[in-house]
Amino acid sequence: MIISAKFITSLVKFDENLSSNFSEVAFLGRSNVGKSSLINSLCKQKNLAKSSATPGKTQLINFFEVTCKRNEEKFNINFIDLPGFGYAKVSKNLKEIWNQNLDEFLKLRTSIKLFIHLIDSRHTHLEIDVNLNDYLKRFLRPDQKILKVFTKCDKLNQSEKAKLKNEFKDSILVSNLNKFGLDSLEDIIIDQTLGLGK
């Protein structure tokens, strides 16, 4: 279980000198899919990760040190809140720099053990999400895993949830509003960062 968390630093671009002694979990997804809200819910802190009121405005790579506990043993991991992608109102030049920085970061950051790909449960087959999944698979190492997490599941009825789970069998459905699915997600995060993931 996650017992505490604190903000460490923000980066505008990849810095190879900022190494990590801990396993890391990267949160990726479209702008406004709920990355910051999910981090806050997992860490049980309302304002740990700041979500921007303007989708696409948050362009920093934010790091959080998270203390976890498993079988009475405490250990630390890092959560990485990545800029939301695919928002049209970001200028083309900024978008290119942004994508280049993220590309370098994701490929070279060997301490990342889990990529959490957040997808809005009401829009599950957007081209941008399909492209992100394919992109991550191209450089995924044996000690890394991609986990699809469908957000805002409180907007779905039981039948829609069952259909979604049946289509994406290894995914997790979550809701920040009613805390649905957060315990299961927490277990996967801890297992994967400890090297116990399936």
Swiss-Prot record:
<feature type="binding site">
    <location>
        <begin position="56"/>
        <end position="60"/>
    </location>
    <ligand>
        <name>GTP</name>
    </ligand>
</feature>
<dbReference type="GO" id="GO:0046872">
    <property type="term" value="F:metal ion binding"/>
</dbReference>
<dbReference type="GO" id="GO:0005829">
    <property type="term" value="C:cytosol"/>
</dbReference>
<dbReference type="GO" id="GO:0000917">
    <property type="term" value="P:division septum assembly"/>
</dbReference>
<dbReference type="Pfam" id="PF01926">
    <property type="entry name" value="MMR_HSR1"/>
</dbReference>
<comment type="similarity">
    <text>Belongs to the TRAFAC class TrmE-Era-EngA-EngB-Septin-like GTPase superfamily. EngB GTPase family.</text>
</comment>
<feature type="domain" description="EngB-type G">
    <location>
        <begin position="21"/>
        <end position="195"/>
    </location>
</feature>
<keyword id="KW-0717">Septation</keyword>
<feature type="binding site">
    <location>
        <begin position="29"/>
        <end position="36"/>
    </location>
    <ligand>
        <name>GTP</name>
    </ligand>
</feature>
<feature type="binding site">
    <location>
        <begin position="81"/>
        <end position="84"/>
    </location>
    <ligand>
        <name>GTP</name>
    </ligand>
</feature>
<dbReference type="InterPro" id="IPR027417">
    <property type="entry name" value="P-loop_NTPase"/>
</dbReference>
<comment type="function">
    <text>Necessary for normal cell division and for the maintenance of normal septation.</text>
</comment>
<keyword id="KW-0479">Metal-binding</keyword>
<protein>
    <recommendedName>
        <fullName>Probable GTP-binding protein EngB</fullName>
    </recommendedName>
</protein>
<keyword id="KW-0342">GTP-binding</keyword>
<keyword id="KW-0132">Cell division</keyword>
<feature type="binding site">
    <location>
        <begin position="151"/>
        <end position="154"/>
    </location>
    <ligand>
        <name>GTP</name>
    </ligand>
</feature>
<dbReference type="GO" id="GO:0005525">
    <property type="term" value="F:GTP binding"/>
</dbReference>
<dbReference type="InterPro" id="IPR030393">
    <property type="entry name" value="G_ENGB_dom"/>
</dbReference>
<feature type="binding site">
    <location>
        <position position="36"/>
    </location>
    <ligand>
        <name>Mg(2+)</name>
    </ligand>
</feature>
<feature type="binding site">
    <location>
        <begin position="174"/>
        <end position="176"/>
    </location>
    <ligand>
        <name>GTP</name>
    </ligand>
</feature>
<feature type="binding site">
    <location>
        <position position="58"/>
    </location>
    <ligand>
        <name>Mg(2+)</name>
    </ligand>
</feature>
<dbReference type="InterPro" id="IPR006073">
    <property type="entry name" value="GTP-bd"/>
</dbReference>
<keyword id="KW-0547">Nucleotide-binding</keyword>
<keyword id="KW-0131">Cell cycle</keyword>
<dbReference type="InterPro" id="IPR019987">
    <property type="entry name" value="GTP-bd_ribosome_bio_YsxC"/>
</dbReference>
<dbReference type="InterPro" id="IPR005225">
    <property type="entry name" value="Small_GTP-bd"/>
</dbReference>
<keyword id="KW-0460">Magnesium</keyword>
